[in-house]
Amino acid sequence: MKVVLIIVAAAALAVPVLSRPTTQNSGNVPSTSSSELKSLPPVNLQDFEGKPVQSDGFKGKIVVLDFWATWCVPCIAEVPMLNKLQEKYGDQGVKIIGVTLASGEAKDVKPFIARNKMKYTVLMGDDDQTYDLNVVAFPTTYVLTRDLKVFRRYIGSTPRKAAEMEADIQKLLAAG
């Protein structure tokens, strides 16, 4: 019993550290790490019927790629913000895509999506690719240019994230 309490306490202390918000803008901030993503690598995604979705199919759109998990409270809190961005910018060539990781099988995730009224595309990710995608905490959100270059990466959630992401989208739309 004491071991369980120690593990729970350690996990509670680790969550704020692991989900601390940071942003990186590859357009304005010099690279400080060789592990930093510069563009979206080919990733294995699936729709909820098990059909593969190729990441190169996102080219030509400004993409907000949000990596999340069903058990992640900050991820769930961001759903309304992502819905609003899809609603506001979807017809202007912006695509919001949620990629669920570490959340079980599609049959487990589908009811979660309906319950949380996710109005943007949600795909199943490959948990083994989290390292390749530099997903170190949930949520991790990438704003990608039309040629799938990383414009900005957000780790965690902050009160400013919605406004900053919207400003990113507007900059990319203005750039053409």
Question: Where would I find each of the regions flagged by the language model?
Answer:
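Core hydrophobic alpha-helical membrane-spanning segments
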Residues: 5-16
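Conserved redox-active cysteine motifs that mediate thiol-disulfide chemistry
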Residues: 67-84
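Short pre-active-site segment immediately N-terminal to redox-active cysteine/selenocysteine motifs
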Residues: 61-63, 67-71, 137
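Thiol-based oxidoreductase modules, predominantly thioredoxin-like and allied folds used
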Residues: 93-106, 118-127
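N-terminal "domain-start" segment that seeds a small globular fold
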Residues: 23-56
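Thiol/disulfide oxidoreductase modules built on the thioredoxin-like
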Residues: 111-119, 124-170
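Active-site acidic short loop of glycosyltransferases
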Residues: 58-61, 91, 118-119, 135
